[in-house]
């Protein structure tokens, strides 16, 4: 309204990455328009509000972030609680056109992460809104350039009109994160160099780009009226079109703009002359504005009187051109103009555009704020929006005029106090929200009726988990209460709390307490409440008729000191209070009555009428007069059981009430009670006197039973309760006895069992208790009971407090209920109109912006990796003889082509450092080369090569992740030093290669050095050299080397041919293998390195090595050309031995393992098992086991799991100490195996579900019969249970395990003493558990025999799963190793070859692979066959006969299906679908190719069944069968091998993803590359074994618990890493981080540690982690869950099961779990 313009300079941070990315950018950026309409803090986002981790938020386009916030604000402004839309068909259509952030982050290739895809996609903007609000309607991004958001509105209208959605959230967004499009628009002349929009102005020369977001909520008009919504305007019509072929695709078309406007008017049947205002697109371009005005004039200006123009305007000069968001912004401006009846003035307008004939146009620019003409019977406006690609859109809106009498629908709220609600997803938000609302109420809020404000907050806003509710009666009250909340001060009527946990029942138990709540004025104020009065008035008449006393009069006068009157008024008050609670929207879901309170409880539960309740209490009170003054009661702080034992059989003093586990009420004769009180006090036991002179619930009242039976004999007709009703008069609180006369005599004389009733409610899940009374009587007792049960998350709330305002305190109790998550029908309490204009959510923003780590590196600034040096930018130091080369080194710039790991970390080979020195100095001799510290590439580092006179050295420092870090933050390390000389004077004699070969005599294997290095842990070479001849004797060797065998003939090398590094790397490597004892050695010092030629090094040469060891391993290595001339030489190259670390180095020795079964370690404390439930369909085998169960252990037998379940339902006791033993039956033939295996596994799954879902305290064991031997069909059929058991142990770690025995002897000892195992094998009567170990040397395949597992050119090789990724890679490997005929079996057929070129794109990689195989000389046959089909063996045999190929010599079974499901969610169909290809498929192959008919039979299994990957029960079971089938065939002499693979990086069903990598890491292992996998195959080929486990172990800190015990023997420990106290179960003595042993201190400690782990994973502050919030709501996704498990395990030194965060979804839950584990 003030003609303000928001144009300004672009924030500096926006373009900063582009300055760094390329030096040329600076020049371009200096020419790019830097002014526009920018948000000051685009990077700010409240990620916590939406449960998005900062890590994920950083990967989200800011457009997604601000759209989320704006959409939320729009819903709040519309009075539509977002959570109420969950699961609805609500649509989201969002205009979006900018992908600046996407370009920014996705062009930073080394740092791309998984969530960046959806995080930067256009669709991610509406989809993110739909996802976070759980909306199920259409969710679409609309890209129509600058028309996008008005088109989105059009789509929203259509979705509602077509019935797709009832509500649509529509809008648009624009964010300018990069300079690219601005540069484009600069060159196109579309934007103004001054960064302003000057719509309609004569000086308009382009627009100023703007950013922001707009959201609009759409509803069908009739629905909005019915829902009592605030309707801002009505969309009468909208239209979208294209402007066709114009002078250019970006040129506007007036005719098209005119037609789309006419279409929109026609949709709404609107006369254009009734439209008073048009919000124009008005991009301020010389061509665009006149064109658009001509179109507007043609539609809206024709027929207009000059005094009655159509006004036009545009919001762009105020906020800029928001491009994709522009239409929505214009729509909002037009809507507000209609609503307020004022036309806003145009900004940045000095002189009207002279190219437009304004006098004839019939339209007029609004130059000053103008009141909407009153001549308009209804205000109407139109909005134009056009895209530069030709999209034209138009909408017509009008004023909403309420229907006559509509206001009468708005019921006015009652006067008096009400409840003001606030909430937030985190506790810290409440004070911020409170202060925001307080300021509003102090100013604008004064213009609103307070009840409408309360209604808005209660019924039109979302209620988050952290809540505050305050009872207020005026604006001043509200201000005071909000100020207290904002400042954290106490206020008697401000309730705060967190909703009970997500898995906790929120239903409320109303507890009606007994005698003792009375106080003088307890009902006086409530009598003014019409609801209260109406509820008790009929009862007042009844009581008067019975005893001549008026309860209402007694409440008014306070005359009710006697016990009989108190009894009556207790009932009356409870009935009245109940009515008031219900009128305020609070209802009970369960009820407990205590003493006389049971009467009102029964009435409210529907078991009695109010009149019946009044008769009971009145007539019983009359009888009480007979015993008044004779008795007494005291509350004693001792358990009822103890007091009862002390009292013995006394009748004059008894336990009358079991109040809580630690207190009770004693009743009896007056004097006896007084004496007892004194006695208890003398013992130091606290007692409290109950204000009564009657010994309720004691034998004193036995004399009243018959009179009471007589008094009520004909007057009660009890009903079945309609609300869950717990009894305190019956021994069983769940007893459903009718509340008849006998019940009430029992209620009078029997003990009150409050503790039992409360515990029964707790057992049924109730955690919220509301005491309905005039003052809390049992609240404390209920609290004690709940705390005694170990509960922490619960609420016990009183309704009234003595001497406190009753009306407000009932509301305060409701406020407290709401804060704990109880359901309150606020519309019942606040039925009136709601207010608009209340503040929306106050965002707690934090800057979140992706730091662009890498930038393209340019010549001269870094080293040339093809030259194999670290020589980067050369800097001469003025006035010195010093030259410095600087560069950056990381994985992308390593100066060697291969891999050179040491202990799992890539390092620059020594040859690369020497090459660097030679090239950097220009010298040909190095002396005293000292290799101090390897140059590691594990993290980016800055490297300097310093040449200072005759010295040279290499130094580096790590590059800090912190932008503010200075060079001093990371000290420089010196890696290598040397002295250099330019010329060599001495000559060197050639070496007679033939003579040396003859002298040595013995030619050894060409791969001797490679195998030697592989054996000691060197997994790969930095350069691809190969030895082609090798001779060795004693301390000499000579070897012919080819630095790149893949390059043949005259083809150029793939690097700079002048580099000496490749051949010198061969020299240092071969030179370390001359020593007799293999060890991992590195060059440490070299006396001299000489280069004797100025020519390039030879591609093929010879290495002459001499062992020159003295104190240390030392060698001389001469590099010869083919003529024997010495071209280079290492003199006295000394090596230092490095401690090997298998598993980290990556050698084949460390990648390939076998499964061993060493004896298990027994536990010190045995598991208690006194009862065994045997389950088996094989009665004979079950009887064998049963006969060996030791005496003293009970046993029961069941024919199936279903039999056990049915017996349980009929009353079988299943206590702690009971174990279920499932015994799969025997199988006689191979044909029975598939059905039997499926039956066995499914029975076990049913057993697990039965135990876990039922929460039964049982252990479960699976007892198999010698599966480990693989000898029999029984062993094969039971084998899948091995894999299944490991998955069960992973998902439910405390359940039990599988025990495999050679004989059917019941393994009770193993059950009791071998704890924490998943599979136990009993061999030679010794219990054993699995461990991974190195392959046994005694199993090496004799070198004299043909190699195993490799193809021969004359054979045929068959691969199942042949068209899968692994199948095709296997085919490639076999062809690479000589196979020439392949049969690829797949369930899918390929199209005819003639159609391959036209095949779908997703099939082309497969076809290309096959063509490649054929181009290399292989014949490939595709056999479409389901190998798991029952007839597969026959079909395969027939197909082989038809093909008439040479014999099949090798089979690879790589077929498989993966369908991950947690055990509790597994279905039989899904389980079988995965199991069949593994079992039936393997058996079909076994039948077609019996043992000893092939060269090899290779089965692709998985290490997942050894490590227990959660969700892979079916997959693990199937792979366990393959493992045993390999054993079975091997026992028969067959070359069968099962390979238990880890994940192949980027390939197959286990293709490495962020989630799979995290899951592997959580188990302590990692994936392998394709080359490593086939290297493992070749390594396995050297051994005669039936299985190999291929994986790489991670390194663990000393003292860190292993995630799985199977790694015990191969795990690598980082020695010396652990600090004092890091050993499991210990802490540094007296250290600051010592773990408390138990109690509250332990829980505080664990809460801090666990929140720290969560914060680390989420990349947020620990203070922002809410202990009671669901981890998923904090932003922990499936990938982060795995990372979190490892963090917890490392921090707390406790093994963490894979499903822990699923079953314990909050930090508080985790604290409880870890407290139990750490406590042990």
Swiss-Prot record:
Question: Main site of residence?
Answer: cytoplasm
Instruction: From the UniProt entry, list the residue stretches annotated as the region Disordered.
Output: 1-31
**What PROSITE patterns does this protein's entry cite?**
CARRIER, KS3_1, KS3_2, PKS_MFAS_DH
Q: Where is the Carrier domain?
A: 1644-1718
Pathway terms, separated by semicolons:
Mycotoxin biosynthesis; patulin biosynthesis
Annotated region N-terminal hotdog fold: the residues are 868-987
Question: Residues in domain PKS/mFAS DH?
Answer: 868-1144
According to the record, the residues making up region (Product template (PT) domain) are 1148-1545
- Give the region (Malonyl-CoA:ACP transacylase (MAT) domain) as residue ranges: 509-823
Positions of region (C-terminal hotdog fold): 1001-1144
Broad EC category: transferase
Phosphoprotein keyword on record:
yes
What function is annotated for this protein?
Answer: 6-methylsalicylic acid synthase; part of the gene cluster that mediates the biosynthesis of patulin, an acetate-derived tetraketide mycotoxin produced by several fungal species that shows antimicrobial properties against several bacteria. PatK catalyzes the first step of the pathway which is the synthesis of 6-methylsalicylic acid via condensation of 1 acetate and 3 malonate units. The pathway begins with the synthesis of 6-methylsalicylic acid by the polyketide synthase (PKS) patK via condensation of acetate and malonate units.
Could you tell me what this protein is called? 6-methylcalicylic acide synthase
In the record, what lineage is assigned to the organism producing the protein? Eukaryota, Fungi, Dikarya, Ascomycota, Pezizomycotina
Gene transcribed to yield this protein: patK
């Amino acid at each position: 309204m003030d003609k303000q313009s928001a144009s300004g300079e672009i924030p500096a941070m926006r373009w900063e990455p582009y300055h760094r990315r390329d030096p040329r950018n600076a020049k371009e950026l200096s020419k790019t328009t830097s002014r526009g309409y920018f948000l000051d803090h685009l990077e700010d986002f409240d990620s916590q509000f939406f449960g998005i981790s900062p890590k994920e938020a950083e990967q989200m386009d800011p457009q997604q972030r601000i759209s989320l916030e704006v959409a939320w604000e729009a819903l709040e402004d519309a009075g539509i609680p977002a959570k109420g839309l969950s699961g609805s068909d609500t649509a989201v259509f969002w205009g979006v056109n900018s992908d600046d952030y996407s370009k920014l982050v996705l062009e930073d290739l080394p740092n791309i992460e998984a969530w960046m895809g959806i995080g930067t996609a256009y669709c991610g903007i509406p989809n993110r809104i739909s996802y976070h609000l759980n909306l199920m309607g259409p969710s679409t991004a609309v890209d129509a350039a600058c028309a996008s958001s008005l088109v989105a509105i059009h789509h929203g209208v259509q979705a509602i009109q077509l019935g797709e959605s009832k509500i649509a959230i529509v809008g648009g967004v624009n964010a300018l994160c990069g300079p690219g499009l601005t540069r484009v628009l600069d060159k196109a002349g579309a934007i103004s160099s001054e960064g302003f929009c000057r719509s309609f102005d004569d000086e308009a020369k382009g627009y100023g780009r703007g950013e922001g977001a707009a959201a609009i909520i759409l509803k069908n008009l009739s629905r909005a009226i019915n829902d009592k919504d605030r309707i801002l305007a009505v969309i009468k019509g909208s239209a979208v079109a294209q402007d066709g072929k114009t002078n250019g695709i970006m040129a506007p078309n007036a005719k098209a703009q005119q037609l789309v406007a006419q279409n929109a008017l026609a949709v709404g049947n609107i006369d254009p002359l009734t439209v008073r205002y048009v919000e124009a697109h008005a991009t301020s371009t010389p061509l665009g504005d006149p064109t658009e005005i001509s179109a507007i004039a043609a539609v809206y200006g024709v027929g207009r009187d000059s005094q009655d123009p159509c006004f036009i305007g545009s919001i762009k000069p105020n906020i800029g051109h928001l491009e994709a968001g522009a239409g929505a912004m214009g729509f909002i401006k037009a809507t507000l103009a209609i609503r307020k009846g004022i036309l806003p003035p145009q900004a940045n307008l000095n002189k009207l555009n002279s190219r437009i004939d304004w006098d004839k146009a019939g339209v007029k620019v609004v130059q000053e704020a103008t009141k909407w003409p009153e001549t308009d019977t209804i205000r109407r406006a139109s909005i134009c929006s056009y895209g530069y690609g030709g999209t034209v859109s138009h909408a017509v809106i009008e004023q909403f005029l309420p229907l006559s009498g509509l206001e009468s629908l708005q019921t006015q709220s009652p006067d008096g106090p009400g409840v003001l609600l606030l909430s937030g997803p985190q506790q810290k938000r409440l004070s911020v929200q409170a202060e925001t609302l307080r300021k509003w109420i102090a100013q604008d809020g004064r213009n609103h009726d307070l009840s409408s404000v309360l209604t808005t907050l209660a019924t039109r806003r979302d209620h988050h988990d952290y809540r505050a509710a305050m009872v207020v009666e005026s604006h001043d009250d509200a201000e005071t209460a909000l100020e207290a909340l904002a400042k954290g001060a106490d206020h008697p009527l401000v309730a705060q709390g967190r909703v009970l946990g997500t898995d906790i029942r929120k239903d409320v138990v109303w507890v009606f307490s007994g005698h003792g709540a009375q106080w003088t004025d307890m009902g006086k104020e409530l009598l003014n409440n019409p609801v209260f009065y109406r509820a008790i008035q009929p009862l007042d008449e009844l009581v008067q008729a019975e005893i001549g006393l008026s309860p209402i009069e007694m409440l008014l006068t306070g005359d009710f000191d006697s016990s009989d009157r108190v009894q009556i008024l207790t009932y009356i008050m409870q009935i009245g209070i109940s009515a008031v609670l219900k009128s305020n929207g609070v209802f009970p879901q369960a009820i407990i009555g205590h003493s006389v309170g049971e009467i009102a409880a029964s009435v409210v539960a529907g078991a009695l009428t109010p009149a019946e309740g009044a008769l009971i209490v009145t007539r019983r009170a009359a009888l009480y007069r007979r015993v008044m003054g004779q008795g007494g009661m005291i509350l004693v702080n001792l358990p009822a059981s103890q007091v009862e034992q002390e009292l013995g059989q006394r009748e004059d003093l008894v336990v009358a009430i079991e109040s809580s586990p630690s207190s009770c009420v004693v009743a009896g004769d007056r004097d006896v009670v007084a004496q007892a009180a004194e006695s208890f006090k003398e013992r130091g036991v606290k007692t409290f006197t109950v204000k009564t002179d009657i010994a309720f619930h004691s034998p004193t009242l036995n004399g009243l039973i018959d009179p009471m039976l007589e008094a009520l004999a004909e007057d009660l007709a009890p009903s079945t309760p309609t609300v869950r009703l717990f009894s305190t008069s019956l021994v069983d609180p769940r007893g459903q006895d009718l509340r008849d006369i006998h019940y009430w005599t029992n209620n009078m004389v029997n003990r009150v069992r409050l503790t039992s009733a409360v515990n029964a409610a707790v057992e049924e899940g109730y955690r919220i208790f509301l005491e309905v009374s005039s003052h809390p009587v049992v609240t404390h007792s209920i609290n004690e009971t709940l705390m005694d049960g170990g509960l922490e998350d619960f609420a016990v709330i009183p309704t009234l407090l003595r001497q406190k305002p009753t009306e407000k305190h009932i509301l305060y109790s409701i406020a407290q209920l709401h804060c704990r998550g109880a359901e309150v029908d606020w519309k019942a309490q606040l039925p009136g109109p709601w207010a608009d204009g209340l503040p929306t959510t106050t965002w707690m923003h934090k800057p979140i912006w992706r730091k662009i780590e890498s930038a393209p590196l340019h010549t001269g600034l870094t080293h040339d990796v093809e030259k194999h040096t670290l020589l980067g930018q050369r800097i001469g130091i003025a006035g010195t003889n010093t030259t410095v080369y600087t560069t950056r080194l990381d994985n992308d710039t390593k100066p060697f082509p291969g891999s050179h790991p040491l202990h799992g970390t890539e390092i620059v080979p020594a040859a690369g450092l020497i090459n660097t020195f030679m090239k950097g100095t220009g010298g040909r001799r190095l002396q005293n080369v000292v290799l101090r510290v390897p140059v590691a590439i594990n993290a980016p580092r800055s490297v300097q090569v310093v040449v200072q006179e005759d010295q040279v050295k290499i130094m580096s420092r790590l590059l800090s992740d912190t932008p503010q870090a200075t060079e001093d933050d990371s000290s420089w390390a010196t890696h290598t030093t040397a002295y250099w000389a330019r010329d060599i004077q001495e000559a060197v004699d050639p070496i007679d290669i033939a003579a040396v070969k003859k002298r040595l005599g013995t030619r050894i294997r060409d791969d001797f050095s490679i195998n030697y290095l592989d054996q000691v842990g060197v997994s790969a070479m930095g350069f691809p050299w190969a030895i082609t001849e090798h001779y060795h004797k004693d301390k000499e060797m000579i070897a012919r080397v080819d630095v790149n065998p893949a390059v043949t003939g005259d083809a150029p090398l793939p690097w700079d041919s002048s580099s000496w590094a490749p051949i010198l790397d061969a020299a240092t490597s071969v030179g370390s293998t001359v020593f007799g004892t293999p060890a991992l050695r590195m060059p440490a010092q070299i006396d001299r390195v000489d280069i004797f030629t100025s020519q390039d090094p030879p591609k093929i040469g010879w290495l002459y090595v001499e062992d020159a060891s003295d104190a240390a391993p030392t060698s001389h290595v001469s590099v010869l050309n083919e003529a024997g001339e010495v071209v280079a030489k290492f003199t006295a190259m000394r090596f230092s031995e490095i401690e090997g670390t298998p598993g980290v180095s990556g050698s084949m020795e460390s990648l390939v393992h076998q499964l061993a079964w060493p004896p298990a370690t027994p536990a010190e404390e045995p598991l208690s098992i006194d009862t065994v439930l045997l389950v088996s369909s094989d009665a004979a085998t079950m009887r064998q086991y049963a006969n060996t169960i030791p005496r003293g252990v009970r046993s029961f037998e069941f024919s199936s799991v279903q039999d056990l379940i049915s017996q349980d339902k009929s009353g079988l006791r299943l206590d702690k100490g009971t174990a279920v033993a499932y015994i799969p039956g025997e199988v006689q033939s191979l044909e029975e195996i598939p059905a039997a295996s499926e039956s066995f596994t499914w029975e076990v799954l049913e057993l697990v579900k039965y135990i876990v879902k039922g929460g039964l305290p049982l252990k479960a064991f699976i007892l198999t019969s010698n599966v480990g031997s693989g000898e029999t069909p029984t062993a094969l059929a039971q084998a899948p249970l091995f894999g299944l058991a490991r998955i069960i142990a992973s998902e439910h770690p405390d359940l039990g395990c599988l025990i495999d025995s050679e004989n059917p002897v019941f393994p009770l000892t193993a059950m009791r003493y071998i704890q924490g195992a998943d599979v136990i094998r009993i061999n030679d009567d010794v219990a054993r558990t699995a461990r991974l170990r190195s392959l046994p040397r005694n199993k090496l395949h004799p070198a004299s025999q043909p190699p195993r597992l490799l193809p021969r050119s004359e054979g045929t090789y068959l691969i199942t799963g042949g068209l899968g990724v692994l199948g095709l890679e296997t085919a490639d490997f076999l062809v690479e190793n000589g196979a020439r005929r392949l049969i690829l079996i797949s369930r899918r057929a390929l199209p005819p070859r003639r159609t391959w070129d036209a095949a779908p794109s997703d099939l082309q990689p497969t076809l290309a692979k096959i063509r490649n195989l054929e181009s290399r000389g292989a014949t490939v046959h595709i056999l479409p066959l389901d190998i798991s089909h029952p007839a597969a063996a026959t079909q395969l045999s027939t197909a082989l006969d038809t093909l008439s190929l040479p014999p099949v010599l090798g089979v690879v079974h790589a077929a498989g299906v993966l369908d991950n499901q947690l055990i509790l969610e597994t279905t039989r169909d899904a389980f079988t679908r995965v199991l069949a290809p593994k079992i039936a498929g393997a058996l079909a192959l076994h039948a077609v190719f019996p043992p000893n008919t092939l060269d090899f039979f290779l089965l692709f299994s998985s290490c997942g069944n050894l490590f227990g990957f959660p969700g892979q029960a079916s997959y693990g079971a199937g792979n366990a069968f393959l493992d045993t089938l390999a054993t079975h065939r091997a026992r028969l002499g067959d070359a069968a091998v099962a390979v238990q693979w880890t994940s192949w990086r980027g390939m197959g069903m286990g293709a490495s993803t962020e989630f799979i990598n995290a899951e592997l890491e959580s188990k302590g292992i990692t994936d392998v590359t394709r080359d490593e996998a086939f290297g493992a195959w070749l390594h396995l080929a050297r051994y005669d074994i039936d299985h190999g486990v291929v994986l790489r172990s991670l390194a663990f800190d000393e003292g860190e618990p292993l995630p799985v015990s199977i790694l015990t023997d191969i795990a690598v420990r980082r020695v010396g890493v652990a600090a004092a106290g890091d050993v499991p179960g210990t802490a540094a003595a007296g250290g600051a981080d010592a773990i408390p042993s138990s109690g509250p201190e332990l829980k505080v400690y664990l809460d801090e540690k666990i929140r720290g782990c969560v914060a680390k994973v989420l990349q947020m502050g620990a203070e922002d982690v809410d202990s009671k919030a669901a981890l998923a709501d904090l932003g922990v996704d499936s990938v982060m869950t795995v990372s979190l498990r490892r963090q917890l395990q490392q921090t707390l030194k406790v093994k963490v099961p894979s499903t822990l965060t699923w079953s314990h979804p909050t930090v508080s839950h985790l604290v409880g779990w870890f407290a139990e584990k750490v406590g042990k």
